[in-house]
Amino acid sequence: YLECYLDKGKRTREEEEELITACVISLLADSCGFEYAIPEIDEDISINKVTAEKSWVKLFNNKVGFISNNKSNPELIFPGSFNPIHEGHIKMKELAEKKTGMHTTFEICANNADKPPLTFYEIKRTLDQFQNDESWMLTSAGRFSEKAEMFPNSVFIIGADTLLRVFDEKFYKNYKDMMNHIQRFNDHNINFLVFGRKINKKFISLKNLKVPEIIADRCTGIDEEMFRDDISSTEIRLTNN
């Protein structure tokens, strides 16, 4: 990947776009084994290469369903992009462990249902955040129904906004298809710890959601009095940028 901060006002918008295009072509050519010189400019250009781990390649080639830094079967799973991980995530982890008595495994999906696949750079940057005593796994399970099949008898730590998407019909072929996917939580004994989140400037918790009856008993809410943190990874990224 390439990093460069262009001096504001030094070039027209068109010149900046031409420069960026040339840089992208250079990186693409390099990844294919060809040479294409990066434009010479006054600003500093930093080029960094990330070499994929063999296990990452196996995951993307569907040779394995997941990889992990912990050989134990995960019991308490915290899915997310963690881009970046922040204090709110840590508090959720600690509360969930205290409530369940289980050890948390952070789950990062390389192929989310509603996001582009992660690049090798994004994978490395994300995994490098975790401490040595923290467990993580990288999976190919984009849907929660797929996670349920991959990790039966597990408890998932999720936000109310994520739970809303689990039973949002637009992510499925139709209503029947959605209910078939949701039924897998019963089939594989999956439970959820649901943390409240601010959605459209309003704090929403489990008690505000209409959860399908067939899995309602599998959802346990964490009250606002116990936890509330309105910060999001998206807001942190925007601030840093």
Question: Residue locations for each model-derived region?
Answer:
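Nucleotidyltransferase catalytic core that binds NTPs
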Residues: 5-17, 22-241
